[in-house]
Amino acid sequence: MYSVISEKISETITLQRQTSSRYIEFFVFRNVDINELWTTDISEDKTHDVWPAINEKSFKKFLENELTSYQRPISLLGIPQNGTVSKTCKREKQRETDCVNYVRKHGNPVTFYPRHRAKRNANTDTCISEEPSILVSHHRNSKMDVFMDANKITLVNRELIWVPHDQVRIVKLDISLCIPDGFFGVIIGHSNDVFCECITEIITDETDISVFLMNLSEHSLMLLPGDVEFSINFLPCYIPEPWEMINLSPPESAVFHLKTCREFIIKPNSYTIQCFDAMYVCADELKALMIPSKEIIKLGLLIETYIWNKDTIPSIKIFNSTRKTIYIPTGICIARIIFTCGHFCLSLMPERAINRLQVLDASSFFLFHYAAFSNA
C-alpha cells in the first residue's frame, strides 16, 4: 500500500525511511496540490490523527499518470518543494539485497544506482544489474588489521608505529579500495595517545592509501598495537554547477581546492583563524566537508576539519605545532573540499588540540568484497 509521507505542499517535507532499507530509496514527485489527494476527515481514535486520511482511489489514479523517477541516496533527506512524495515499491517485493526496485509502466523491474548529478538527473535512467559494492584489497604484510562492518571499514594497527619528535609520520595502510562512481571515502583516525593526532583524509579511488600522524609532544612516540584506529566511511558525493560556486576553481575528481587569497604567518605553538572569500548556493541538504591539504600537513600545521554550510564563508582554524614561525604565501592550497549529503558533527575533545569529526550516517549499508594479496 502506498502512503503519502509529506505534510503540506511548499513546506519543509519530512521523509520516513523503512527500517529494512539499506541502500537507496526512490521517490516520485509531480507538481500538484497535495490537498486534492487527502480527505478532510481525520480519525480521532486511531493513529490517523497524526496524518490526514488518504483517498486510495484518487491516489492510485494519480500514480497512473506520467511520473518522473527521482533518484537520491537514502542519506539525502528532503526533496524539492512543490512535490508529492510516495514509496514506489512494497516491502515484500524487495530482494535480499534490500535495494528498492522501481517498476516501470510496462512492468519490468529495474534496479537503479545513484550516479553523479549529471547522470542522476538525466532524461534516461542509469541502471546496473548488480548491487553496488566496494572492492577491498589488503596486503598480507600490512601493519593494519582490517575489520569490515555493515557500513564502514575499520583498521587497527597490529605492529608498533614510531612517530618521531617534531615530525609528521606518513603511514601506508597497504590497502586499496575500488569505490563506485558517485561515492567517496572519509578516513577518521583516533589514537590512544593524546599527543598523537590523526589527520582526517578523503579518498575517491586510490590504490595507495596513506594517512598522516602528527606528534605534538616534546619527545618521540611509540604507539603500541591497538593504539591507532582508523574508520573509513563511504558517502555519496556531489558536484555543484559552476554558477552555484563563488571563488572556487573547477574540481579534480569531485574534490575542490581552497587556496589562500592573501599571505599570513603563524607563530610557533599558536592558533590562527583564517576566513576565505568563497561561498556556494546549493540545496539546503548539501554541505561541504573541508579537509586539510597534504602540503599544509607536511609543513607541520594542524587544521581542524570544517563543515561548511551554504550561504556562509569558510573560516579555518590552523594550529602551528612547530617551534618556528611559518609563512604561508598567496595561492597555496589550504584545504580540500568535497560536497556531500552526509551528516557530520564535530566531537568536542578538550584534551586534544583539535576536535574530531564524526560521521552520523549509520543507516547506509555496503557490500564489501575482500581480497588479500602479496608482492610477487
From Swiss-Prot:
InterPro entries found in the cross-reference section: dUTPase-like, dUTPase-like_sf, HSV_DUT
Enzyme class label: hydrolase
Cofactor: Mg(2+)
Known EC number: 3.6.1.23
Biological process according to GO: dUTP metabolic process
Alphabetically ordered keywords of this record: Hydrolase, Magnesium, Metal-binding, Nucleotide metabolism
Gene3D superfamilies on file: 2.70.40.10
Record-annotated disulphide pairs: none
Entry-linked Pfam families: dUTPase
UniProt feature coiled coil, ranges: none
GO molecular function, one term: dUTP diphosphatase activity
Function in brief: Involved in nucleotide metabolism: produces dUMP, the immediate precursor of thymidine nucleotides and decreases the intracellular concentration of dUTP to avoid uracil incorporation into viral DNA.
UniProt protein name: Deoxyuridine 5'-triphosphate nucleotidohydrolase
